Amino acid sequence: MKILITGASGGIGFLTGLVLAQRGHYVIMTTHTKKQEVVLKEKISSLGYSNVVVEKLDITNSYDIEKFKKFDIDVLINHAGIGVGGSIIDLDIDSLRYNFEVNFFSSYNLAKIFLNNLISNNKSGRLIITSSIAGTIPFEFLGSYCSSKAAITMMARVLKDEIKYLDRNIKISVVEPGAYKTGFNEVMIDSANDSIEEDSPFFDKKEEIYDILKLKFSLASLHSLKSIVIQIVLAVEEDNKKFIYLSPFIQRMFKKIYALLKY
């Protein structure tokens, strides 16, 4: 299959692209910036992959979106995303909007373009959206990120049910990574800490909040990305109606327990 992955310059997106290429798929790995594109092209070239191409695709950029429309792909993995930290009370509206612009609206836009292309050309295909366990379980001072991921998961749920009416071979899946040591969560926690300024009602607790967030993610995070990459590969290749792909196992169990106890 011909697969496009957004946000593939590093971490989960990068490793997923390599594994899918190793399994014989043709993979388009995309990056947010031109600099990332150059670096990733060098990496791919050094690894000797002939079935991988690298493209710059800023999912918020209208020019790049026009370029995306020209790709003839079977699978879209909407992986690109950002994490904006900060209290709901403190966070400025522009930061919240930008978090949703990347994680929700831009992801929605790509999905809409991709699916309309499949439908108009009478093709089968798969849309895989990377959400997060944070879209189900709330994390204090990361409300913007949690909310954006909850929104994209719900959109995918509705989309999955709508597609059924078309009687097409189009599969919609959501991947929910738990905590992994990719650097993403660390940056988000730092941004949460930076957002607590002297005029914040949380300022006196700033150090305590930062330490608690770091401890939570330090205890929960896994170094190996293997478990979540396996789930994404399954979402690409499995012939079933499974919707949510979640890993690691311990956090999958925690999500189930939380669902039982939250009310």
Residue locations for each model-derived region?
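Conserved NAD(P)H cofactor-binding loop of Rossmann-fold oxidoreductase domains
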Residues: 79-84
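Substrate-binding pocket helix/loop in short-chain dehydrogenase/reductase
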Residues: 65, 87-88, 95-97
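SDR active-site lid
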Residues: 165-240
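Conserved glycine-rich cofactor-binding loop
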Residues: 9-10
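Active-site helix of classical SDR
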Residues: 111, 148-151
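Conserved glycine-rich Rossmann-like NAD(P)H-binding loop of the short-chain dehydrogenase/reductase
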Residues: 23-38
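Residue(s) in the substrate-gating loop at a strand-loop-helix junction
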Residues: 132
